Amino acid sequence: MISGLSHVSIVVPDLAAAARRLRDMYGLVIGEAKVNEEQGVRLAYVELGNARIELMEPARVDSPVAKFLERNPNGGIHHFCLAVGDVESTVTQLRDKGARVLGDGKAQVNVHGARIAFVHPKDFLGALVELEEHQDEEGGAR
C-alpha cells in the first residue's frame, strides 16, 4: 500500500522569497513554479534525491492554502505525502478501515500528472496526508 515518503509540503506567504531563502541559506535548488488551477495553488519543488520539499503559496484568495495562511500568516508545514502504488485501491482499503478521504473521494491529478487523494487529519494522528501514485516504467509501484 505505502511505498515511501514523496514530499513534505510547506505553505509560504511568498514563494519567490521562500525559494531565495532556501537557496541562499541552504544551497538548495528550487524548481520552476507551476500552478495547480484545481487546487488554487502555485507550487515549486526542492528535489532531495529520495524525497522532495514542496513549497506552496495561494494562487487564489479562495483556495484552502489561502485559508491556511489566514490562520498561520507566516506559513508552515501543511501536509506530508506518501507514495503509493495505486491510489484508488489504497483509498478503498483505507475507507474499508474507516478512514475519511477528503473531497468526493475520487483521485485528482497533480501538476506532475500523478493521481492523488487526501486523507482527513483525524485519521492520521492529526496530520493531513496526501497519497500520490508512484509507478515505475512497467506500471508497478516504486
Map each language-model feature to its residues.
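Short, flexible turn/loop "capping" segments at secondary-structure junctions
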Residues: 1-2, 71-73
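Short connector loops at helix/strand junctions that flank enzyme active sites
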Residues: 41, 48-50, 72-77
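Conserved secondary-structure micro-motifs at functional edges
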Residues: 29, 55-69
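Short, charged/polar surface micro-motifs in flexible loops or helix N-caps
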Residues: 49-53, 60-62, 87
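Short, structured motif recognition centered on aromatic/hydrophobic residues
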Residues: 5, 9-12, 22, 46, ...
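Long, hydrophobic N-terminal alpha-helical segment
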Residues: 1-41, 63
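Vicinal oxygen chelate
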Residues: 12-20, 34, 44-47, 54, 60, 72-142
